[in-house]
């Protein structure tokens, strides 16, 4: 993987790990302090807001990130791009906030969603403005390649939200207190982010007039296509919540949202790759380096499969333990929807890097078509299954919609001009998952102490998974060290040295055993480890623990 891209991914992943940890700590507190019903109302409001903000901010944020990253020789290119999108951001935010206030004042909100929701939409109107400039500032910094600034702003956003929202929820302010947390956090990030942007490009460029050669039409066309794409993506995220609110109680919505939250934890690495790849591959596309792009995309697909699969297997093995501990006993109904969502979450994770590379080219026709097929299937299935099966139907429909994304975007990628499966090794990655799942689930089964299971199963399961990945060839021996080489020293330098030594020994004489022999060997090893866990370890662990 290109080192600059890898370091960019590492920067984003590092921050996402921190944000995920903070979110993981705050989410169960919100669930407990609000209760399932109010948490369901909060989840519903966020889903409506996310869909609404597509039309307010998506064209701005995606556009400024893409066009700033392009290597153009036009005079004052960066200033003109920043100014163009800043003006657009101001106008769209003003219109977006006004329309929400108008809908609340005219009673449209109460008629559509029920009494009591109008007050929340006044808060959402203010959030439209602050969220618009928060996202504009962060994506502008990313367009400049300044992830070292843009990503810590996410930590500021999360910490500020927690500091405000959790105490307000605890003292009984309810959903409005949590929305106030979002408002304060986004305002702080917007101010800090715009101050950093101003150091790179003075925001007085707001009043500058670009030349006639400035590609306004191309930018607006990209904005329109980007809005369509993001709308389709967001429908996959949120249409199930919106539909479930119509047919089931707020408590069901809250528990289903709890299941979604855990399933979406699988996406933090794929999201980081997607975030960096959009602007990192734009330059490769401008240089027409298709072979490099295919190599990059297929390896990203393989790494995403392996990382997401091991997390999915671990979460499935520990679901009965993790959900009640994490959210409380009231969230036990979320366990089955969570298990139904995991296969689809894996498929969606695989689609993310592929979509990002396609976005980097700027031609969104095929990605939109691919996403549209998955989104349409998702809407149809949710409409068919939710009225009868509730949150279980929503989970099945959403999982199928998510999984379809990977298939559709593989087709889209070939149309765009790259092959995301060139070095993906999907069969070997799938075999790794199946073989490793048996001992991991067996280990989780035999450990009866829940806290001990949470401490032991994830690290041991990861080692088992990586071992099988190396045995079946889903990973080359040097690749784990190649990934570690982008970490700070001393880890990075030592991993790089080990990687070089492995690559020096990596001649093409490795096929000494047939594939069938290797398959039989690893299958036998999987059964052996499973039997060991169920037999010897089961007796030993249960004798040591209460």
Cite the ranges covered by each PLM segment.
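Signature of the first transmembrane helix
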Residues: 3-61, 93, 97, 101, ...
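Helix-loop junctions and terminal segments of transmembrane helices
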Residues: 56-73, 143, 263-304, 308, ...
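Interfacial segments at transmembrane-helix termini and the short loops linking adjacent helices
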Residues: 106-124, 316-349
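Hydrophobic alpha-helical transmembrane segments
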Residues: 122, 153-202, 260, 373-378, ...
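Membrane-interface junctions at transmembrane-helix termini in multi-pass inner-membrane proteins
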Residues: 129-154, 176, 342-374
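C-terminal transmembrane helix end/exit motif
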Residues: 147, 167-168, 183-211, 399-449, ...
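Interhelical loop/hinge segments that connect adjacent transmembrane helices in multipass membrane
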Residues: 172-175, 179, 193-237, 280, ...
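Membrane-proximal transmembrane or re-entrant/amphipathic helices at the cytosolic face
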Residues: 442-546
């Amino acid at each position: 993987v290109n080192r600059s891209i890898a370091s960019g991914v590492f920067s984003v992943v590092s921050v996402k790990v921190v944000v995920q940890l903070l979110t993981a700590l705050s989410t169960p507190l919100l669930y407990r302090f609000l209760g399932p019903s109010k948490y369901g109302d909060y989840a519903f409001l966020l889903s409506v807001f996310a869909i609404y903000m597509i039309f307010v901010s998506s064209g701005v944020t995606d556009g400024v990130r893409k066009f700033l990253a392009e290597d153009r020789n036009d005079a004052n290119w960066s200033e003109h791009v920043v100014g163009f999108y800043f003006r657009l951001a101001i106008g769209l935010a003003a219109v977006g906030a006004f329309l929400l206030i108008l809908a609340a004042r005219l009673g449209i909100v109460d008629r559509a969603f029920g009494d009591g929701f109008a007050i929340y939409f006044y808060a959402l109107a203010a959030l439209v403005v602050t969220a618009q400039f928060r996202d504009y500032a962060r994506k502008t910094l990313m367009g400049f390649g300044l992830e070292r600034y843009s990503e810590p702003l996410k930590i500021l956003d999360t910490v500020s939200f927690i500091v405000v929202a959790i105490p307000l929820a605890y003292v009984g302010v309810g959903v409005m207190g949590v929305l106030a947390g979002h408002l304060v956090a986004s305002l702080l990030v917007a101010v800090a982010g715009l101050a950093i942007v101003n150091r790179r490009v003075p925001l007085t460029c707001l009043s500058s007039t670009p030349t006639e050669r400035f590609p306004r039409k191309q930018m607006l066309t990209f904005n329109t296509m980007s809005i369509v794409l993001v709308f389709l993506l967001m429908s996959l995220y949120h249409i199930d919540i919106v539909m479930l609110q119509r047919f089931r109680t707020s408590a069901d919505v809250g528990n289903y949202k709890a299941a979604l939250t855990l399933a979406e934890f699988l996406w933090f690495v794929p999201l980081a790759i997607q975030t960096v790849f959009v602007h990192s591959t734009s330059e490769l596309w401008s240089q027409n380096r298709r072979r490099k792009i295919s190599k990059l995309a297929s390896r990203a697909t393989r790494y995403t499969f392996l990382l997401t699969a091991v997390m999915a297997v671990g979460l499935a093995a520990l679901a009965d333990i993790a959900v009640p501990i994490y959210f409380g006993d009231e969230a036990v109904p979320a366990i089955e929807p969570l298990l139904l969502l995991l296969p689809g979450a894996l498929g969606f994770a695989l689609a993310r890097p592929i979509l990002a590379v396609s976005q980097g080219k700027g031609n969104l026709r095929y990605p939109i078509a691919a996403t549209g097929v998955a989104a349409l299937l998702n809407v149809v299935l949710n409409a068919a299954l939710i009225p009868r099966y509730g949150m279980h139907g929503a989970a099945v429909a959403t999982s199928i919609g998510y999984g379809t994304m990977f298939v559709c975007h593989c087709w889209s990628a070939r149309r765009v001009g790259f092959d995301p499966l060139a070095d993906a090794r999907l069969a070997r990655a799938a075999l790794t998952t199946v073989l490793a799942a048996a001992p991991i689930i067996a280990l989780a089964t035999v450990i009866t102490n829940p806290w001990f299971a949470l401490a032991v199963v994830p690290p041991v399961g990861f080692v088992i998974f990586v071992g099988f990945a190396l045995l079946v060839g889903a990973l080359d021996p040097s690749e784990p060290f190649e990934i570690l080489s982008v970490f700070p020293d001393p880890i990075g330098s030592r991993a790089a040295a080990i990687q070089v030594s492995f690559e020096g020994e990596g001649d093409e004489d490795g096929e000494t055993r047939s594939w069938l022999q290797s398959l039989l060997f690893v299958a036998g090893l999987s059964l052996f480890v499973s039997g060991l866990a169920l037999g010897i370890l089961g007796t030993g662990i249960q004798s040591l623990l209460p």
